[in-house]
Swiss-Prot record:
Domain Helicase ATP-binding: 23-203
Span of domain Dicer dsRNA-binding fold: 564-658
GO terms for biological process, alphabetical: defense response to virus; regulation of defense response to virus; siRNA processing
Recorded superkingdom: Eukaryota
Gene behind the chain: dcl2
GO cellular component labels: cytoplasm; nucleus
UniProt keyword annotations, A-Z: Antiviral defense, Antiviral protein, ATP-binding, Helicase, Hydrolase, Magnesium, Manganese, Metal-binding, Nucleotide-binding, Repeat, RNA-binding
Annotated EC: 3.1.26.-, 3.6.4.-
Name of this chain's protein: Dicer-like protein 2
One MF annotation (Gene Ontology) recorded for this entry: metal ion binding
Length: 1388
């Protein structure tokens, strides 16, 4: 059947090696046979070659990978599919019954949509011979175990019958490129055959030439050991084993005339010829079954001994009986043949074998097997992993059983059998084949994982099959040829491993050096380095002087060739570290006709493509000199490209990234005093240009009478927005201001009257003794003409004794404020008169009053029983009993309280006017070029939280922070196309850090306009002209953070006022170095994508993203992981990921901020952090998939097939371009956790009232999953010319916006479990993390939870520190809420 595996299980750690890149480059220039030792990474070179070919070939071309066995096809397909997850690949083997596909339509359907096919040689040879596949459709042919391409092998048939004729007829453009892979190009110990293999494959044999030392470093040759044994007498079996002797006697005396086949032929006169042939040859189906069974039994006796032979005979007879009883057999075998075989074997005295024997002497074994046991017993390895090669399949099953039960081995070895997937003649055998093919499916995985540590196998495991490096390999029989010797030895590739060969004591050809000598002769045929090793060593000892020199005039810094290597390595060492990527420079060399060398160096993929690859300029005799000169040229190019400063050092943590020297800025700074607009008003009264505004006060939104007043000032009055004042929980006052108008010719007397009226209002509502000064800067009066003010003042100024008011029968609704002089004039509100008639001659008059309201800050709603009541506010005594006061001790103000109440509003109005004047001044001075339409947003941005104003900057600071980060990121990205992500991140950090923003506030004078004064305090007093004229300028203390916050808040305010354009103008005013308008987003330097990018980045991906790129190189770059070192023309995605991170922040923050439900800054910050959480982005990346149709072939009857269709999901992560088995393993581990947690996380995102912190922490996805989302987002932003709209579409497409809307609409709880636990504990709760190393060199994490230094519990066995902390917090929540009905956080 076809294999469609997408993950390579148990992949061993793998890192890019120079010699593999060398072989890749060689294969791109010509057809080659890669000849390297087993385990040195030939398959990974093939994977790189496939990637490169898919990048350049048309999309209708195929890459065809050929392997000699089905098992090897399955394994190699797993490796290819794991490394090319976005490419559709499949296997075609006999398991698919390919030999029955006899129609072109079937082949067309099978190959439709696939780019890489893995098959045996015979499958492709047959397909080519029948014309189902054309040679012209193949782009690349890869021959694994290429030494098979000789004589009549199917591999050679492909080349001889199809490749070479097509090449001769149509030229090289009509045939595929060729790559061969082999560890032993000479099969039969004849090194001359190398030339034949090269000719047949139209390729030249290559081993890594320059990097031979690296190849040796990674390839471990085992210790070679001989195991001698005394051979068994072949004729001794008759007397040694009763069961085997009886079987052999029964076979020798078998009468062919009793065979059912012979009897059937005798009954039919038409079958006379067949009868004569059968009698002459003695071959019938039953006799062949018995003959092979007897031969195998004898072989097992000779190889393993009597016990194994008897076990094999007994187990085979039992198996046959079970099959007959279960109707297992089918086909042409009739009932008579069944009965005949069963009857024959029933006469053999085979008794049941005892397996649980403790005495080694009970196991009658052969001298050969005893030698093997002695050898195995001599091994002293804690981590044993071994492989035993035997000749026959029957020996595999018998030896596996014997080793599994023998007392000397059963406790030490965990054995498994492996014979591959091609049944061969065993498919016709129903007797003596004890191996269950299904049981070996997991054998290799079990061996890799350590569940099995010893495999007994036939030669199927010689070639190609990827098994873990073994510490011991035993050849139970001599290798038949040099190829087997090399291949088997290559399996023992652990350090200090052993390769053992068993020899009989009478073998004259046991000289192991025979194979070693032949192998050395073969190597010398294609490896110049080995033949010329001494001359090369002599050359390298030469002292070649490299005279290159670079001097920087401005600093006198000098770079010489001798220093260049150290400088270049240092430059790479300080690049942003990346897991799975080698950050070292990679050197390679080319040789000219004179044997001279020229170097090339390739830097890590985060470096810009223009300077990533540098070639030397001269030819040298030694590698050392070539490396020096190449390193010099590379570092010189980095300097000229702006990645190294004038001191010839990398820019990281250097002044080049610091636009301002901030030094060590303290956290608290001395700043200008808050700008006081009343000072200017005080001076303006000397020659006033009087303006006034009509004020209308309405109670409860207009239900009731209006109170109309006037506000007068000596200069222009800015427009004031309506104000809502909260009297109590049921009463509000709305204060509106009409447009101010200029009032000419106001007499001085009228101004004085207004001063007196203002003082009257302020005194009427104040229990404190008021100042006698009346030179107020802002004046208030009733809405009367100025000529009427004197009469009004005479009517309402002063007070009357309460008894006098009582005697006049004054209207209670027009009563003024009651003042009790027995209590030092304490004010009360009149309720009613109380008259006592107990003494008729002298009635007692009293007043029932209400307490005078203490609240002064009417801008905020009254907060009853709230622990957060302001310190200067008291909870009203509305529930207290109304006080009774004596009338003769009281006076009552003439100004009715219905009018006097306005005095309580004056402080709020004056404070509001003051803030408006500050904002207006700021708008007209520092921010005059920004283009604010009004001051409303400015007021919010400059009001600090401790001013207790109606609004403060916190929400705008949240918005402005993201806008600033976004703007700075864009500016640096487009302005510095040569900078890698490390420089960009550091440059951004320098600009957006609090000290830089605080300095911007100080440099522009913004600090003076930050409102910190407490609004509407009970100690408030009206500003006076005399005080303001005498005011001495002072300083105030302010934190660096407040200054920075206001800068960010103003940026947010500008965005709210006029969108991105106004925000950019504000940034430009406060931070002159950021001018995004001057940057052309269309001219950013981009990587040069390979021509083939359009083929790899097919329509599936474009549909997936939902955006069509004008410049597809951006998409290629967005999907290029830093480990992708094989493509030096494309930069890794780190720059785009850096930009996409800021774009994502901007998209998310805008959605949060503009939601109808306004949330405080803290809640918005929590939501943002939850939504852009890397694990959530990674989960959505894993979930983001498009569906496409997949064609396949299904068998409908014995000989017919039909095309079937199905849907296949293609996830976004599959398109990432990378290299490395360690990344594969990490990716597959993340995907396995995703499969385990998917339902839980998906359900939480759709239905849970809480954010799935716990499940996401257990997901622990590798960072590259979330990086892909951000890098694609950055690519869309760049390609669209800086348009956020298509970015929002992509964020919507992956499902992030839908979840954000659910969080906002349904108020999902996004608090982190640690925060919830800390709130519940109401005391000091500690989470103590600890890394716990394990024996394998890894580590797990544990977290202990402590309250008041007492340990509650410990969570252990977590994959990461984050998972440990979150799990511990969840358990703490359960503990702290154990007595409650529910918990505040979902702990599932």
């Amino acid at each position: 059947m076809a294999s469609s595996v997408t993950a390579c299980q148990g992949a061993s750690p793998y890192q890019p090696r120079n010699y593999q890149l060398e072989m890749l480059e060689a294969s791109m220039k010509e057809n080659i046979i890669v000849a390297m030792d087993t385990g040195s990474g030939k398959t990974h070179i093939a994977v790189l070659r496939i990637k490169a070919e898919l990048d350049i070939c048309p999309p209708d071309k195929l890459v065809w990978f050929l392997a000699p066995t089905v098992a090897l096809c399955i394994q190699q397909h797993e490796v290819i599919a794991s490394n090319l997850p976005a490419v559709r690949t499949r296997t075609l083997t006999g398991l698919d019954k390919v030999e029955l596909w006899t129609e072109q339509s079937i082949w067309d359907a099978v190959l439709n949509g696939y780019r890489v096919i893995v098959s045996t040689h015979a499958v492709l040879a047959d397909a080519l011979s029948h014309g189902f596949v054309k040679m012209s459709r193949l782009a690349l042919l890869i021959f694994d175990e290429a030494h098979h391409c000789t004589r009549r092998h199917a591999a050679n048939k492909i080349m001889r019958d199809f490749y070479h004729p097509t090449l001769t007829k149509s030229g090289p453009g009509a045939v595929p490129r060729i790559m061969g892979l082999t560890a032993s190009p000479v099969v039969r110990s004849n090194h001359q055959e190398l030339l034949t293999v090269e000719s047949n494959l139209d390729a030249v044999c290559r081993t890594p030439r320059v990097h031979r030392q690296e190849l040796v470093k990674f390839t471990h040759r085992p210790h070679l050991q001989q195991i001698w044994y005394t051979p068994t007498d072949p004729a001794g079996f008759k007397s040694a084993s009763q069961t085997l002797g009886a079987l052999y006697h029964a076979w020798e005396t078998l009468d062919i005339g009793d065979d059912p086949y012979i009897q059937r032929l005798r009954k039919s006169p038409l079958d006379d010829t067949a009868l004569k042939k059968a009698l002459l040859t003695g071959k019938t189906y039953c006799r062949e079954q018995l003959r092979r069974f007897v031969d195998r039994s004898r072989h097992i006796f000779e190889e393993l001994g009597e016990w194994a032979a008897e076990y094999y005979i007994y187990a085979s007879i039992k198996q046959l009986g079970d099959r007959v009883r279960n109707s297992y057999m089918s086909g042409d075998w009739d009932e008579a043949e069944k009965a005949y075989l069963v009857d024959f074997l029933s006469k053999i005295p085979a008794s049941e074998i005892q397996l649980a024997l403790n005495d080694p002497g009970s196991f009658r074994i052969s001298p050969k097997f005893e030698s093997l046991l002695n050898f195995l017993d001599s091994l002293d390895e804690r981590e044993f992993s071994g492989l035993i090669f035997v000749k026959q399949r029957a020996t595999v099953s018998a030896m596996t059983s014997l080793l599994s039960v023998h007392p000397c081995t059963r406790e030490r070895f965990r054995c498994a059998a492996y014979v591959g997937w091609s049944n061969g003649s065993a498919s016709k055998d129903i007797l003596g084949d004890l191996l269950n093919m299904q049981l070996q499916r997991d054998t290799l995985d079990d061996f890799r994982s350590g569940r099995k540590n010893l495999i007994i196998a036939t030669d199927v495991l010689e070639e190609g099959i990827d098994i873990s490096a073994c510490s011991v390999v035993v050849c139970y029989d001599k290798p038949p040829n040099l190829k087997s010797f090399v291949q088997r030895r290559g399996r023992a590739r652990r350090k200090q491993s052993t390769f053992a060969i068993m020899f009989p004591t009478d073998d004259a050809s046991a000289d192991v050096s025979k194979w070693q000598d032949l192998e050395q002769a073969m190597i010398e045929a294609y490896q110049d380095d080995e033949r010329q090793l001494q001359s090369v060593s002599a050359l390298e000892s030469l002292d070649e002087e490299v005279m290159e020199r670079l001097t920087v005039e401005s600093t006198s810094a000098v770079l010489t060739a001798d220093m260049a290597m150290a400088h270049l390595h240092h430059f790479c060492a300080v690049l942003p570290p990346q897991p799975y990527a080698d950050m070292r420079p990679v050197f390679s060399f080319e040789t000219n006709e004179d044997g001279l060398l020229k170097g090339t160096v390739i830097l890590p993929s985060c470096v810009h493509p223009k300077v990533r690859r540098t070639e030397g300029r001269r030819w040298w005799r030694t590698e050392r000199a070539a490396m020096k000169e190449t390193a010099f040229q590379a570092y010189k190019a980095l300097y000229e490209f702006g990645l190294v400063n004038d001191h010839l050092l990398p820019l990281t943590k250097r002044p080049e990234l610091k636009s301002h020297d901030l030094g060590a800025m303290p956290s608290i700074l001395e700043t200008s005093e808050q700008y006081d607009p009343w000072i200017e008003w005080a001076y303006s009264w000397s020659s006033p240009d009087i303006h006034q505004s009509r004020i209308v006060v309405r109670m409860n939104e207009g239900r009731g009478d209006e109170l109309c007043m006037r506000l007068m000032g000596p200069t222009y009055l800015p427009p004031l927005s309506p104000m809502t004042l909260f009297w109590n929980n049921s009463t509000t006052f709305t204060v509106t201001f009409e447009a101010a108008e200029r009032v000419p010719l106001v007499p001085l007397s009228s101004v004085e009257d207004m001063r007196a009226i203002t003082a009257l209002y302020l005194k009427a509502t104040n229990s404190r003794v008021c100042s006698s000064e009346r030179d107020f800067t802002a004046l208030f009066a009733p809405d009367l003409h100025h000529t009427e003010l004197k009469g009004w003042l005479n009517a309402y100024e002063g007070c009357d004794p309460a008894m006098e008011v009582y005697s006049r029968g004054h209207n209670p609704l027009l009563m003024g404020v009651v003042r009790d002089h027995s209590r030092y004039g304490e004010p009360f509100l009149f309720r009613k008169w109380l008259v006592s008639d107990q003494n008729p001659s002298c009635s007692v008059v009293e007043l029932e009053c209400a307490p005078f309201p203490h609240r002064r800050n009417l801008l905020h709603r009254q907060r009853l029983a709230n622990s957060q009541v302001d310190v200067d506010e008291e909870t009203p005594e509305s529930a207290a009993k109304n006080p009774i006061v004596a009338a003769d001790a009281c006076t009552i103000d003439r100004l009715p309280f219905t009018m006097a109440i306005f005095g309580l509003f004056i402080s709020a109005i004056v404070e509001r006017l003051e803030t408006e004047l500050i904002a207006t001044r700021l708008r007209e001075t520092i921010l005059r070029d920004v283009g604010f339409k009004s001051t409303d947003h400015i007021i919010t941005a400059i009001s600090t939280p401790f001013a207790h104003a109606l609004t403060n900057y916190q929400r705008y600071e949240f918005l402005g922070d993201s806008i600033l980060k976004f703007s700075v990121s864009c500016q640096l990205f487009f302005q510095h196309p040569n900078w890698h992500e490390g420089y960009l991140s550091e440059g951004r950090a320098m600009i957006v850090q609090n000290p830089r923003l605080a300095k911007a506030a100080l440099d522009t004078g913004l600090d003076a306009y930050i409102v910190t004064k407490r609004i509407a305090s009970r100690k408030w007093s009206a500003p006076l002209i005399s005080e303001k004229l005498e005011r001495v300028p002072a300083k105030r203390q302010m934190s660096t953070k407040v200054l920075a916050d206001v800068v960010e808040a103003l940026i947010g305010a500008a965005y709210m006022d006029g969108g991105h354009a106004t925000a950019q103008a504000c940034i430009r005013r406060l931070l002159p170095e950021i001018n995004l308008h001057a940057v052309d987003t269309r001219t950013a330097t981009r990587s040069v994508a390979p021509e083939s990018a359009r083929h790899m980045m097919n329509e599936r991906l474009k549909d997936h993203i939902g955006y069509t790129f004008e410049d597809e190189s951006l998409l290629v770059e967005a999907l290029t992981h830093p480990s992708c070192d094989y493509d030096s023309t494309t930069q890794s995605y780190q720059r785009l990921e850096y930009l996409g991170d800021a774009v994502l922040d901007m998209v998310i923050v805008s959605a949060i901020f503009n939601h109808p439900i306004q949330r405080p800054q803290g809640d918005m910050t929590k939501i943002k952090h939850a939504v852009v959480n890397a694990n959530l982005l990674a989960f959505l990346c894993m979930e983001s998939a498009t569906s496409e149709e997949k064609l396949d072939v299904a068998q409908t009857s014995k000989d017919s097939f039909a095309v079937t269709t199905s849907q296949e999901s293609v996830e976004l992560w599959r398109f990432m371009r990378y290299r490395g088995q360690n990344l594969n393993a990490a990716r597959d581990a993340s995907l396995a956790r995703h499969r385990a947690l998917r339902d839980e996380i998906a359900s939480s995102l759709l239905h849970a009232p809480h954010y799935p912190w716990h499940a996401l922490s257990r997901l622990n996805a590798d960072k590259f999953f979330s990086d892909i989302v951000e890098s694609v987002l950055g690519a869309i932003f760049v390609d669209s010319g800086g348009d956020l709209a298509p970015c929002e579409v992509f964020v919507e497409r992956i499902g992030l916006m839908a979840y954000l809307r659910r969080i906002l609409d349904q108020e999902i709880d996004v608090r982190h479990p640690r925060s919830v636990a800390q709130q519940l504990a109401k005391t000091n709760i500690q989470f103590v993390l600890q890394r716990v190393p394990n024996e394998e060199g890894g580590a797990s994490y544990q977290c202990s939870v402590r309250i008041e230094q007492a340990e509650l519990f410990v969570v252990t066995g977590c994959l990461t520190a984050e998972e440990a902390e979150v799990t511990a917090a969840v358990e703490a929540i359960k503990f702290l809420t154990r007595d409650e009905g529910s918990t505040p956080l979902n702990t599932s």
